[in-house]
Amino acid sequence: AKARSVTESILVKNPNIKAVFGSNDNMALGAIQAIKDAGMKNVVVVGFDATPDAAKSILAGDMTATIAQSSYNMGALGVRHALDLANGKKIAANIDTGTELVTKKNAKKYK
């Protein structure tokens, strides 16, 4: 509900907006509702987390995309690097655990 109302306020000030990025899928889904309520079309909406609701929204043609994180890699690499640190080893400051762009082409596997 908050993302919807925040997006409504943004759309009043920016009626020609072309794209919205939600920090998570629930925010993106709220933005989609505000965009629909405003009667706007062709606004690119991208979320983050690849939730089943986002996948359904993508397949329905409402959300453009979402970004999936690799929870397996986050867990496995997190444990591995925690053990490395506990054993006095140095680890990289940043560790890429991987992401995947979810679009209509691959959204079915996230439903």
Features from the language model and the residues they span:
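A residue-level marker of the well-folded mature domains of exported/periplasmic proteins
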Residues: A1-K111
